[in-house]
Amino acid sequence: MKKISNNIFFITLIFGTLVTISSNSWLGAWMGLEINLLSFIPLMNDNKKNLLTSESSLKYFLTQAFASSILLFAIIMLMFFYNNNFLLMNNYNEILILSTLLLKSGAAPFHFWFPEVMEGLSWINGLFLMTWQKIAPLMLISYNFIYNFFMISIILSMLIGSLGGLNQTSIRKLMAFSSINHLGWMLLAMMNNEMLWMTYFLIYSLLSISIVLMFNNFKLFYFNQIFNISLMNPIIKLLIFLNLLSLGGLPPFLGFLPKWLVIQNLTNMGQLFILTISVCLTLITLFFYLRLSYSIFMLNYQKNSWMLKNNYNNKMSSINLLLNFISISGLIMIFMIYMIM
């Protein structure tokens, strides 16, 4: 029965996002966001015995409900004064609507809820929060992009995403701050090219799925649990290490491709100041990925009797190997195809 209800909620979750991105009015977009929210809450609260999960789902609901109420208020004002037109909005209404969408997506300076909610979720639900749940708000943001307003959010997202992950001992919080940093890059890509941010999001989602599935299989939630995999196959440890480097955007891995495209675009437009800041802050995120990798490779602990056996089954192993191959060698394959063509 629980599996059937979860499947229904999962279908309505996808339906809500599709309603939002295909809507031609703000009210229809709001309805899609609400369908998405009310479908995701039961999926988040999959383990009722875990109080941290219940707390996270409550925090998520309160934050999203607050954002939705402000968004509905702004939409009513828009319908009353401007006949629900996307283009005929004054700055006050526009900033109010876009601020609520930034709050829903977890971008700085409205990011306060995101790491705390991530901390209480399972890896699969956290993956949905980092990827699928951002699609609808980002699509709505791309319809109305205010340069000066979003420049502040871009810089703050990259800054907080980089510095916030430095002192973390929780892998889920580290991934949350990493997501905030990547969200800054997506907004930066959106500033110049609508297709560019979609490409960035697609590759980021692929890399996140690859690394999160590995964390989920080994039940890794904190840095000290990484010592458990010191007795693992060295190839598995190497795959985690390379995936982290790819997520950090280090060449020649696939994660470098979207950043490369954004850098190229910004260089052509002469926006060197924001480009320099973005690259410098990304180096900090690469540092805490390397710090996580150091725990995997350099530190060795004796196996304790209380350590749980991992459930890294063959089926999931094959899926992970495919995703890892794409993540690690994707950029090389794209370059080879480009050279052939």
From Swiss-Prot:
GO molecular function: NADH dehydrogenase (ubiquinone) activity
InterPro entries: Complex_I_Subunit_2, NADH_DH_su2_C, NADH_UbQ_OxRdtase_chain2, ND/Mrp_TM
UniProt-listed GO biological process terms: mitochondrial electron transport, NADH to ubiquinone
Protein EC: 7.1.1.2
Source domain of life: Eukaryota
Transmembrane segments: 8-28, 61-81, 95-115, 145-165, 174-191, 195-215, 238-258, 270-290, 321-341
Catalytic activity: a ubiquinone + NADH + 5 H(+)(in) = a ubiquinol + NAD(+) + 4 H(+)(out)
Keywords: Electron transport, Membrane, Mitochondrion, Mitochondrion inner membrane, NAD, Respiratory chain, Translocase, Transmembrane, Transmembrane helix, Transport, Ubiquinone
Enzyme class: translocase
GO cellular component labels: mitochondrial inner membrane
Predominant place of localization: mitochondrion
Membrane protein topology class: Multi-pass membrane protein
Subcellular location(s) of the protein: Mitochondrion inner membrane
Protein family: Belongs to the complex I subunit 2 family.
Function statement: Core subunit of the mitochondrial membrane respiratory chain NADH dehydrogenase (Complex I) that is believed to belong to the minimal assembly required for catalysis. Complex I functions in the transfer of electrons from NADH to the respiratory chain. The immediate electron acceptor for the enzyme is believed to be ubiquinone.
Protein name: NADH-ubiquinone oxidoreductase chain 2
